[in-house]
Regions:
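Short, Lys/Arg-enriched N-terminal segments with co-localized hydrophobic residues
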Residues: 9-11, 15, 21-37
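Cationic, low-complexity basic patches in intrinsically disordered or flexible, solvent-exposed regions
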Residues: 3-4, 15-17
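Non-globular targeting/processing and membrane-anchoring segments
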Residues: 32-114, 119-130, 134-144, 148, ...
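Short, solvent-exposed coil/turn linker segments
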Residues: 4, 102-103, 159
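Thiol-based oxidoreductase modules, predominantly thioredoxin-like and allied folds used
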Residues: 147-162, 175-184
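N-terminal regions encompassing targeting/leader/pre-sequences
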Residues: 1-2, 9
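Residue-level marker for well-ordered alpha-helical positions
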Residues: 140, 161-164
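Short, conserved SAM-binding/catalytic segment
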Residues: 166-174
Length: 266
C-alpha cells in the first residue's frame, strides 16, 4: 500500500501533489482488504484457526463500512424537511454569556448546517443523564473539528445557570451550550415526553436554504440511535467482553431522577 510521509508531502511540487491526490482518491474507492492485503497479514504466534476466523469477520466488517456509507449517501439525498416552526429563543449557558438570549437562527453563525443535540437534563433533575453526559464529554473534545464544517450546539431543558455549573464540573470548555427552559423547541421537535422533565436524547440537523431554515434529519429509531457518535459503546464492541450489561456508561455520579423515572419505572 502506498504511504505518504509528512516530509514527503512538504517537498512535493504542484504536479506531484496532483498525482498523489489522484492516487489517494482511487485508494478511497478501493476496498480496504484489497489495498492492505489483509490475507497476508499475521500477528506473532497466531494460529491458522484465528486467521481464518479473522478473515471471515473482516468481510463482515467491510460490508458494515459499505452499508454505513450507503446509508449516509441516502441521508444526504433527502429532500428538505419541514420549515422551522418558529425562530425559537434560547439562553446561552457558556461562560461569559450565561442567560443571554440567542435566537435559533443565530446558532448557525456563518454555517449553513446546524447539529443540535438535545440531552437529558430537566429543570427538576438532581443531576443530568449519565449517558448523555458521556456523549457530551466526547462532543466537547471534537467540537472544534466539527465546527469547521457545521455549527454544533447542545441543548437541555434545565436553566442556563445549572447547565453552566455542570459544564464546569465536567470540564466542558468548547461545545456551545444553550438552555431551552423557556422555549417550546424540545416539545415541538419530539425531544421530550408529556412534561419538561421527561426529556429524550435526540440529535437533529437543520439546514439554511434560500434564507429559510429547514429540518434535514433527526434520530427516529431507538435509544441506541446515537451509537455511531458514542465512543464508549463502540470501544467496548472491540473487546472480548463486549458491551457491559448496564443501562448507562460508568460514571462517578448518579442521577436519582433518571433512576426513579426511567430506569426503575414499571
Amino acid at each position: 500500500m502506498w504511504q505518504l510521509s509528512l516530509r514527503g508531502i512538504l517537498w512535493m511540487d504542484k504536479r506531484q501533489l496532483s498525482v498523489a491526490s489522484s492516487h489517494l482518491e482511487n485508494v478511497s474507492n478501493t476496498s480496504f482488504k484489497e489495498e492492505t492485503n489483509m490475507s497476508e497479514l499475521q500477528y506473532p504466534n497466531e494460529s491458522r484457526e484465528y486467521r481464518d476466523a479473522r478473515e471471515s469477520l473482516l468481510k463482515d466488517e467491510q460490508e458494515l463500512v459499505d452499508k454505513v456509507k450507503s446509508v449516509a449517501e441516502k441521508r444526504r439525498k433527502l429532500p428538505p424537511g419541514g420549515q422551522l416552526k418558529e425562530d425559537y429563543v434560547f439562553q446561552w449557558a457558556n461562560d461569559g454569556k450565561v442567560g443571554k438570549s440567542v435566537k435559533f437562527s443565530e446558532l448557525f453563525g456563518d454555517k449553513n448546517t446546524l447539529l443540535l443535540y438535545s440531552w437529558m437534563y430537566g429543570p427538576n433533575w438532581d443531576n443530568p443523564c449519565p449517558s448523555c453526559t458521556s456523549l457530551v464529554d466526547g462532543f466537547d473534545r471534537t467540537w472544534y473539528q466539527v465546527t469547521q464544517n457545521a455549527a454544533f450546539v447542545a441543548i437541555a431543558k434545565a436553566p442556563a445557570e445549572r447547565i453552566n455549573a455542570w459544564a464546569k464540573k465536567r470540564g466542558w470548555s468548547q461545545i456551545a451550550l444553550v438552555s431551552g427552559s423557556e422555549s417550546p423547541y424540545q416539545a415541538d421537535y419530539k425531544c421530550q415526553g408529556d412534561s419538561d422533565d421527561m426529556q429524550w436524547p435526540v440529535m437533529h440537523v437543520f439546514r439554511k436554504q434560500d434564507g429559510k431554515i429547514f429540518h434535514f434529519w433527526g434520530t427516529e429509531t431507538s435509544m441506541n440511535h446515537v451509537d455511531t457518535v458514542w465512543p464508549y459503546w463502540n470501544l467496548m464492541d472491540f473487546t472480548p467482553e463486549g458491551r457491559p450489561d448496564i443501562p448507562t456508561p460508568p460514571q462517578k455520579f448518579r442521577s436519582e431522577f433518571l433512576e426513579k423515572h426511567y430506569l426503575n419505572k414499571e
